[in-house]
Amino acid sequence: IPSIYLKKNSNIIDIGGGTSSLVDKLLIEGFESISVLDISSNALEKSKHRLGKKSKQVQWIIGDVLKVDLPLQCFDLWHDRAAMHFLTNVNDRQVYRSKVLASLKPGGFIAILTFAEDGPDRCSGLPVQRFSIDTLSHEFGKNVCLVAGEKHSHCTPGGMEQRFLSCLFQLTGAHE
């Protein structure tokens, strides 16, 4: 996110944000329009509790990203640190893609962290979809341009190395 120039009033949504501290950091940096979506109401409640009074500055959305109604052409940044890789069904990924593209403003950004093609095939006991820069770019189609992509490693508390892929895309074409 630091590599993107966003105004403090930019609309940001964090998909699968749950107990992530990204919302804390965005508030500290002065961002004014933050939404956090997660399927777990418990995870969102933990974040609200952690933030205290600041939690009132955030729009909290409980729901499945594939089913929740999101505003059209609203967001300047769609951030997903750990949700898309759980979409192992191609139809689910097509719905996800449609949600992303419909809810982004023209010129909006997509920041996604997923498991790399040589990353683990399961997370929290569930199967995951792994991606290369090319396959992730293909998922979003021709109206989205890759700004940056990078593979990196993470060491789990158990000492296992996991390979991740982080990509930043920008909506450059017409909405579909």
PLM regions: where:
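Short catalytic micro-motifs in class I SAM-dependent methyltransferases
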Residues: 82-86
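Class I (Rossmann-like) S-adenosyl-L-methionine-dependent methyltransferase catalytic domain
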Residues: 1-73, 87-103, 108-176
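A conserved beta-strand element that flanks and buttresses the S-adenosyl-L-methionine
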Residues: 79
